[in-house]
């Protein structure tokens, strides 16, 4: 239960951190889409561990294998299965955590729900589960580009109290990928990297905010009431490990404005299209895309597994102390960027297919 996401473009992820591998099955991908393992690998490389000095030192190539659904470089319209095998596992690092719960991790809640858990690396609750999401997101991104020239770009907006100045309307992928923290504000990026390194040396962790923009989203994507576009995006990104907050457009800052100040006034552009002067709605009104850029932010908490000693309890209910071992990110934000992009792309791709299926038939 809870392992499948989407309606027409639907994914099911599988696997655990220290099991044989992780992956995804994608249902509903249109046939005849040209896709290669290399295109998927580009996205996986952006989220893989061990990519820089500020990420987990776990060394995984995360090489993807397309097992089904693609023939001679084109999708068949049948389920696409993608597998990434785990290579650099160290289950012995987690022996102590078989009995001791990590504070603010999923250990205790998984035990409460299932009565059993794979304690090696967090099992299913590990961020390695997101490999399947990012692989599927690579395919969703290609569909969006090919059909509607949609581009989805995420970046680190804030690390702890360091907040970058970035224009979501003009930011480019090259700017995002110009440094290891994935903050397009180059000057602040250096300070972010230094802060992450310093925190990691102290055996601690920090969080922050990823901002994401989707440009050229067709007007009309989204559904009324329960399947509003922003509601589906919120569910998608809030299902990511360590996510703790979501806002779109003006977000919580919009509560400080009056209606006159907040409303996005309309005008007709040079092509005769209805546009808005401002974009405090974040590209969505009434749950439906209005053609402006969709701009959202996701808050990620500090990584739960840290080397500093903390109070905790055992499975048997005894109070104890834990200084966690293992290899963990001192800050999840740099690797969370492609995860957020993937989830936004999956939602937009699903709604694109739903919109065409209902509103482009007659």
Curated annotation (Swiss-Prot):
It holds the Pfam family Chorismate_synt. It is an enzyme of class 4 (lyase). One of its GO terms (cellular component) is cytosol. It comes from the Bacteria. It catalyses: 5-O-(1-carboxyvinyl)-3-phosphoshikimate = chorismate + phosphate. FMN binds at residues 124-126, 286, 301-305, 327. One of its GO terms (biological process) is aromatic amino acid family biosynthetic process. Its EC number is 4.2.3.5. The keyword Protein transport does not apply. Belongs to the chorismate synthase family. Homotetramer. This is Chorismate synthase. It comes from Nostoc sp. (strain PCC 7120 / SAG 25.82 / UTEX 2576).
């Amino acid at each position: 239960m809870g392992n499948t996401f989407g309606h027409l473009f639907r994914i099911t992820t599988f696997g655990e951190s220290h099991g044989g591998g992780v992956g995804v099955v994608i249902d509903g991908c249109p046939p005849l889409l040209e896709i290669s393992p290399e295109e998927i690998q580009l996205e996986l490389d952006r989220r893989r561990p061990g990519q820089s000095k500020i990420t987990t030192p776990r060394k995984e190539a995360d090489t993807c294998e397309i097992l089904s659904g693609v023939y001679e470089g084109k999708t068949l319209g049948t389920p696409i299965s993608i597998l990434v095998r785990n290579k650099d596992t160290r289950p012995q690092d987690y022996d102590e955590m078989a009995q001791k719960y990590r504070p603010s991790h999923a250990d205790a809640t998984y035990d409460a729900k299932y009565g059993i858990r794979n304690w090696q690396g967090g099992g299913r609750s590990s961020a390695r589960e997101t490999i399947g999401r990012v692989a599927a997101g690579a395919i969703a991104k290609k569909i969006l580009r090919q059909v509607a020239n949609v581009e989805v770009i995420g970046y680190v907006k804030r690390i702890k109290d360091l907040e970058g100045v970035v224009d979501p309307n003009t930011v480019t992928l090259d700017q995002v990928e110009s440094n290891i923290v994935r903050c397009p504000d180059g000057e602040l990026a250096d300070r972010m990297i230094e802060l992450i390194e310093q925190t990691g040396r102290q055996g601690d962790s920090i969080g922050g905010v990823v901002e994401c923009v989707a440009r050229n989203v067709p007007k009309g994507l989204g559904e009324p009431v329960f399947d509003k576009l922003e509601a589906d995006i919120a569910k998608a990104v809030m299902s990511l490990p360590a996510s703790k907050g979501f806002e779109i457009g003006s977000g919580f800052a919009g509560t400080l404005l009056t209606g006159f100040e907040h409303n996005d006034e309309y005008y007709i552009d040079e092509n005769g299209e209805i546009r808005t002067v401002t974009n405090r709605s974040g590209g969505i009104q009434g749950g439906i895309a209005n053609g402006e850029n969709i701009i959202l932010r996701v808050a990620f908490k500090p990584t739960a597994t840290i080397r500093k000693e903390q109070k905790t309890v055992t499975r048997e209910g005894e109070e104890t102390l834990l200084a966690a071992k293992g290899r963990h990110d001192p800050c999840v934000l740099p690797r969370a960027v492609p995860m957020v992009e993937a989830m936004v792309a999956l939602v937009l791709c699903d709604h694109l297919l739903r919109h065409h299926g209902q509103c482009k038939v007659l």
